[in-house]
Amino acid sequence: MNSIDLPSLAEATPTIRHDWTREEAAAIYHAPFADLMFRAQTIHRQSFDPNAVQCNQLLNVKTGGCAEDCGYCSQSAHHDTALPASKLMDPKKVIEAAKAARDAGATRYCMGAAWREPKDRDMAPVIEMVKGVKALGMEACVTLGMLSDAQAKQLADAGLDYYNHNVDTSEEFYSQVVTTRSYGDRLDTLAKVHDAGIKVCCGGILGLGEKPTDRVEMLRTLANLAQHPESVPINMLIPIEGTPIAATATPVDPIEFVRTIALARIMMPKSDVRLAAGRTAMSDEMQALCFLAGANSIFIGDTLLTTPNPGDSKDRQLFNRLGINARGELGVHVHSHG
């Protein structure tokens, strides 16, 4: 383990960098736990309220039948997961769901469709959804797969605020997870989204069989982009029967997960770090450590796409125990985002 110079941490400022090396990122990740947490919490407090958590709502507007072969995903047409494919939801029903989320305190709404990439004919109903959400006074986010420049511009013109497009893991490990697209394809879409003026939401998944080095490299890739993603969701794998990775997945050590959250906060000090999927398998104590390490955002509701989530009642109890700001219907500072 590498020791970190504590006096320098006390004077740490949230400097935005895009030139992190493998060696320094790894040294931070593997530092003594107390030193790592101190540095992450110090940086976190300089940009965020340490007692506030952003809450995000996510709706699956098109389920299953995806042409990609992501080894963890129940929505891939390549896997036998007994998940029926559905058509794109009626925009009116999506907007009704967004209104319910707004009435529960949400200010941002994310809509996900299980596509490799949207066809041009898909854009009109998606744009209707985006405009409908915006008309409710909410921010809008979508995740649709890869985009063309023209599609990114269409979404920007419709007023889209955020686009979610995760890199999942490191470039070195990526081919062990997905073979139907390249890591470069993901980065290319991120560039198109950024160039269109849409904010980027991009993170990854822990528990795919990756090594700690892969977690470090995933975050280093994001931190070294021309602009840091405005949101960085960190997911813990929920193994789904019928997916290839479920057969070989091993649980992520809780401390290793917390280290990843801390590294994300240190390397991307102004970004929201989202404690995303997998919270049903986390103890309250593990989640508390993640918040202490710099996580300032979660997903609310009973489900995330096709996987379970703790639900508002349980989250409210946790937030009350931790003294998290009591604002909004859930009892926290509420936004809604994917």
UniProtKB/Swiss-Prot annotation:
Look up the record and give one Gene Ontology term from the biological process aspect. biotin biosynthetic process
Which cofactors go with this protein? Answer: [4Fe-4S] cluster; [2Fe-2S] cluster
Which of UniProt's keywords are assigned here? 2Fe-2S, 4Fe-4S, Biotin biosynthesis, Iron, Iron-sulfur, Metal-binding, S-adenosyl-L-methionine, Transferase
Specify the pathway.
Cofactor biosynthesis; biotin biosynthesis; biotin from 7,8-diaminononanoate: step 2/2
- Please give the Gene Ontology molecular function terms for this protein: 2 iron, 2 sulfur cluster binding; 4 iron, 4 sulfur cluster binding; biotin synthase activity; iron ion binding
Output the InterPro entries linked to this UniProt entry. Answer: Aldolase_TIM, BATS_dom, Biotin_synth/BioAB, Biotin_synthase, Elp3/MiaA/NifB-like_rSAM, rSAM
Q: Where does [2Fe-2S] cluster bind?
A: C110, C141, C201, R274
Q: What is its EC number?
A: 2.8.1.6
Cofactor, free-text remark: Binds 1 [4Fe-4S] cluster. The cluster is coordinated with 3 cysteines and an exchangeable S-adenosyl-L-methionine.
**Where is [4Fe-4S] cluster annotated to bind?**
C66, C70, C73
Which reaction equations make up its catalytic activity? (4R,5S)-dethiobiotin + (sulfur carrier)-SH + 2 reduced [2Fe-2S]-[ferredoxin] + 2 S-adenosyl-L-methionine = (sulfur carrier)-H + biotin + 2 5'-deoxyadenosine + 2 L-methionine + 2 oxidized [2Fe-2S]-[ferredoxin]
- Domain spans labelled Radical SAM core: 51-270
Iron keyword on record:
yes
Q: Which SUPFAM superfamilies match?
A: Radical SAM enzymes
Cystine pairings recorded for this chain:
none
Q: Which domain of life does this protein belong to?
A: Bacteria
A Pfam entry, by short name: Radical_SAM
Q: Is Transferase one of the keywords UniProt gives this record?
A: yes
State whether it acts alone or in a complex, and with which partners, per the record: Homodimer.
Cited function: Catalyzes the conversion of dethiobiotin (DTB) to biotin by the insertion of a sulfur atom into dethiobiotin via a radical-based mechanism.
Q: Which family does it belong to?
A: Belongs to the radical SAM superfamily. Biotin synthase family.
Q: Which PANTHER family match?
A: BIOTIN SYNTHASE, BIOTIN SYNTHASE, MITOCHONDRIAL
What is the protein's given name?
Biotin synthase
Q: Which organism is it from?
A: Rhodopseudomonas palustris (strain BisA53)
Q: What are the leading ranks of the lineage?
A: Bacteria, Pseudomonadati, Pseudomonadota, Alphaproteobacteria, Hyphomicrobiales
